[in-house]
Amino acid sequence: MDLPVVLIADKLAQSTVAALGDQVEVRWVDGPDRTKLLAAVPEADALLVRSATTVDAEVLAAAPKLKIVARAGVGLDNVDVDAATARGVLVVNAPTSNIHSAAEHALALLLAASRQIAEADASLRAHIWKRSSFSGTEIFGKTVGVVGLGRIGQLVAARIAAFGAHVIAYDPYVAPARAAQLGIELMSFDDLLARADFISVHLPKTPETAGLIDKEALAKTKPGVIIVNAARGGLVDEVALADAVRSGHVRAAGLDVFATEPCTDSPLFELSQVVVTPHLGASTAEAQDRAGTDVAESVRLALAGEFVPDAVNVDGGVVNEEVAPWLDLVCKLGVLVAALSDELPASLSVHVRGELASEDVEILRLSALRGLFSTVIEDAVTFVNAPALAAERGVSAEITTGSESPNHRSVVDVRAVASDGSVVNIAGTLSGPQLVQKIVQVNGRNFDLRAQGMNLVIRYVDQPGALGKIGTLLGAAGVNIQAAQLSEDTEGPGATILLRLDQDVPGDVRSAIVAAVSANKLEVVNLS
């Protein structure tokens, strides 16, 4: 069998290739060369890039086999995420690969600005020894304002606190209780401006945050404040900051990012009190290596059909360690629902009960859709394209939660309703410390069977000797029954049997079973 092709379009560390493993074929292409890229992508199952290669709609259209685009870094400016989503292509980045490097660089700028390191260095290199010109300011005992408490902002806050500073922060999306856990005083933006001796910005750039530190904001700061921006260019108005430094209101500043990059001309460059670097926040050997290995792991997971935590175009909410083990089980429940349905359902609902209901479980809706469509769609069904497939085929999907779960700590029910009103309902749970996947209910009938391997599901008219007839026919065909579960209908003469087998059932044996027990439904379902 041919190995999936991973196309690397930019320079990446050798550790990235090693992390991809030996179950893929790695190819290289000069990604910035458009002609070469378009010639190479048709055979690619995965495309790895950094910032030099542009992955737009044209590239995606030329890659019919493509399952994932992986950006070895944080930014995604060079990847058309919307076009990828429309084609069902997963897009991932490495959001945590550079967070330590970025946090350390912000601290380096803050320290350099507070102690006039760059000025003193230039003076001494000019053969001038004049200590009195470079009197700095301590961080100890000061108030440091962190604007944005994301991953990097939290790291900066923790490190600044170690200097003996009092840390305050502004972030409208962080709960006060969470800030308190971090030992940080949360407040409004204006209050932070008025109180902080140092301000370090750690926000994403959005229409709402662009120009956040402008002339008006700077006027609200304490005289002698020191400002650092190592997050995104354009968050700080560079002209307004330069004016504030010249006036003496802002003591010093440190910037690693600029509104337009590459940037070789700025009013800030004329000011000795301002320390500038050319967007070096992620420029460490460790960050670059980590970015490559992180996206390599995402590629490995995607090509194996598994959930990819760092996917940016999966509308499934945050997937934490409590929810992640349920993804595979719920996908299998979707497969079983499809097998027991006479037609593609008009609606699919996922109901989560018990302890799991308190988590963000939106991703389980996508898992159920993946299972449902995996048996009826020839192409790969992913967390990305499953919602689009449902919309195209008129299948509505919802997820609900409830606290009641009398027999299990948590249960997930997947319910499909056909256009004629007929219902198929499968429930499953994770059992014991090993989180064994189990089917616990089929159409209202209680079961207790592991959700694994080859399974034979039969609905038939209950009659004496039916199970013996089924076993005899399977045994004669050399098919071994590993486990069995039988449940009678609560109303009427019907029964449902679920058998786990060691192999598939030949077509003629299926027909013989249907005839022998008057089965009105027989399906073989692979839950491997």
From Swiss-Prot:
InterPro entries (alphabetical): ACT-like_dom_sf, ACT_dom, ASB_dom_sf, D-2-hydroxyacid_DH, D-isomer_2_OHA_DH_cat_dom, D-isomer_DH_CS, D-isomer_DH_CS1, D-isomer_DH_NAD-bd
Catalytic activity: (2R)-3-phosphoglycerate + NAD(+) = 3-phosphooxypyruvate + NADH + H(+); (R)-2-hydroxyglutarate + NAD(+) = 2-oxoglutarate + NADH + H(+)
UniProt entry tagged with the keyword Amino-acid biosynthesis: yes
CDD domains (alphabetical): ACT_3PGDH-xct (cd04902), PGDH_4 (cd12173)
Catalytic EC class: oxidoreductase
Metabolic or biological pathway: Amino-acid biosynthesis; L-serine biosynthesis; L-serine from 3-phospho-D-glycerate: step 1/3
Keywords attached to this entry: Amino-acid biosynthesis, NAD, Oxidoreductase, Serine biosynthesis
Chain positions recorded as NAD(+) binding sites: 151-152, 171, 230-232, 256, 279-282
MF annotations from Gene Ontology: NAD binding; phosphoglycerate dehydrogenase activity
Active site, per annotation: 232, 261, 279 (proton donor)
EC numbers on record: 1.1.1.95, 1.1.1.399
Domain ACT: 455-528
Functional summary from the UniProt entry: Catalyzes the reversible oxidation of 3-phospho-D-glycerate to 3-phosphonooxypyruvate, the first step of the phosphorylated L-serine biosynthesis pathway. Also catalyzes the reversible oxidation of 2-hydroxyglutarate to 2-oxoglutarate.
PANTHER family recorded: D-ISOMER SPECIFIC 2-HYDROXYACID DEHYDROGENASE FAMILY PROTEIN (AFU_ORTHOLOGUE AFUA_6G10090)
Family (UniProt): Belongs to the D-isomer specific 2-hydroxyacid dehydrogenase family.
Name of this protein: D-3-phosphoglycerate dehydrogenase
